[in-house]
């Protein structure tokens, strides 16, 4: 079974830790119901955007909090009744740190990607705030894949840029539909947001998004490049 969501080694994470779902009903911010994942090697918490496509769970990951006073070694998470997130850190005789930290929502909505949905020919991106005017050069896509094998690890293979062929901003300004020149199963589609701001001039909080595409909307999940011995 292919991984539903891959965390690219190095750029996104090195050692992901406990996943925890935000069940605070808005007490922790605008991402209720989404999953957070820790990271041992750097001061980062990641957020997961689940996408159900033709009966299969796949989706994207992106940084949620980078640094911002966090310590490394985030290994355990629990939400308190007041909606705050307690983070336990350890080094386990390895990378990481020690500590116990509490994260609370400031009450201000950050400018960030809230949903990423696969479409027939690209992606539908939804943000927490209306976007300022956008163009194709604001959305830099590339794709790559990893060996699907029994051995430990894999380099990124088949890395190539993917051209944006069309985009359309929704009437409320929060969503943008993006068409891509290449859309195939078995790849991680990496999106780097360049100079994206909200209409109120708030800069986007995190700019790196990695979507694991296992299945297209028509149900096709054929990925011969993942099979051992294929070119």
Regions found by a protein language model. Name each.
Residues 117, 168-172:
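Blade-terminus and WD-like Trp-Asp/Gly-His loop motifs, strongest in beta-propeller folds
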Residues 106-115, 132, 156, 184, ...:
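Acidic, Ser/Thr/Gly/Pro-rich low-complexity segments and short DxT(G/T)-type signature motifs
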Residues 1-110, 122, 133:
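Beta-propeller domains with acidic blade repeats across secreted/periplasmic ectodomains
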Residues 38, 179-181:
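Surface-exposed loop and edge beta-strand positions of immunoglobulin-like domains
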Residues 125-166, 191-198, 207-211:
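Short, surface-exposed alpha-helix to beta-strand junction/turn motifs within ectodomains of secreted
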Residues 80, 170, 198:
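Acidic surface patches and DE-rich sequence motifs
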Residues 121-125, 176:
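Structural beta-strand segments of beta-rich domains
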Residues 181-187:
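Surface-exposed, short loops/turns at beta-strand junctions within beta-sandwich domains
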């Amino acid at each position: 079974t292919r991984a539903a969501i891959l965390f690219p080694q190095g750029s996104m994470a090195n050692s992901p830790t406990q996943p925890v779902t935000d069940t605070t009903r808005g007490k922790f911010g605008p991402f209720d119901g989404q999953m957070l994942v820790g990271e041992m090697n750097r001061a980062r918490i990641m957020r997961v955007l689940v996408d159900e496509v033709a009966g299969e769970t796949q989706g994207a990951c992106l940084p949620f909090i980078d640094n911002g006073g966090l310590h490394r070694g985030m290994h355990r998470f629990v939400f308190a009744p007041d909606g705050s997130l307690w983070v336990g850190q350890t080094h386990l005789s390895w990378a990481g740190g020690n500590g116990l930290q509490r994260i609370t929502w400031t009450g201000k909505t950050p400018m960030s990607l809230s949903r990423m949905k696969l479409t027939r020919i690209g992606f539908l991106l939804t943000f927490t705030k209306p976007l300022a005017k956008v163009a194709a050069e604001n959305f830099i896509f590339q794709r790559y894949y990893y060996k699907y094998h029994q051995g430990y690890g894999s380099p990124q293979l088949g890395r190539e840029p993917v051209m944006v062929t069309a985009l359309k901003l929704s009437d409320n300004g929060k969503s943008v539909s993006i068409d891509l020149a290449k859309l195939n199963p078995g790849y991680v589609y990496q999106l780097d947001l360049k100079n994206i701001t909200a209409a109120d001039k708030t800069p986007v909080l995190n700019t790196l998004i990695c979507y694991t595409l296992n299945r297209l909307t028509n149900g096709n999940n054929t990925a011969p490049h993942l099979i051992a011995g294929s070119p």
